[in-house]
Amino acid sequence: YDRVGLDETIVVTRSNKRANIFNQGIRNQILYREEELTAGDLLLVAKNNYFWGKDYKEVDFIANGDVARVVRVLKRTDMYGFRFADVQLYFPDLEVEMEVKILLDTLTSESPSLTREQQETLFAQVLADYYDVTTKREKMKRLKTDPWFNALQVKYAYGVTCHKAQGGQWKHVYVDMGYIPQGAVSLDFYRWLYTAFT
């Protein structure tokens, strides 16, 4: 990190579980960050989002794989059985800073984004707030404009899966192959390794 900085260094690994281990290690042992989220943290968007970019002419949508730097953590809230934070993020590739609501639950999740079950729970909980809306169409319209339902799903961006790293470019890339048992090296492994290198 001293040589090329946080923005130009990444660990590419095979699973979200391994990415979480690297992210926690890098945040705690190298960056000395103990809080869950702090200014300066690098985040990776885990799911396309069309809600938060709508007020910015230079942003069509925030794409899965976009990287953002936390400028400020404004407020944390527990709602609908999930943890959220209002944060100010800077997106270097988009060259825009925006205030968004993020889901903290996805930061260390072993799934790529909210699981189907979690997504359904959030959907049902937010939809319940619109009990007074009589038509299904109007409820769906409200849901599309609800900041809680449309919270940005993010992960830490220090260690990521090969899938999430695709299309990115860094000066220093560390490829973690993890433990490879005897005989586990297959064509699939070599394909993954090729993708990681390219």
Regions found by a protein language model. Name each.
Residues 7-198:
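Core RecA-like ATPase module of SF1/SF2 helicases and allied nucleic-acid translocases
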Residues 1-7:
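Conserved interdomain hinge at the start of the Helicase C-terminal
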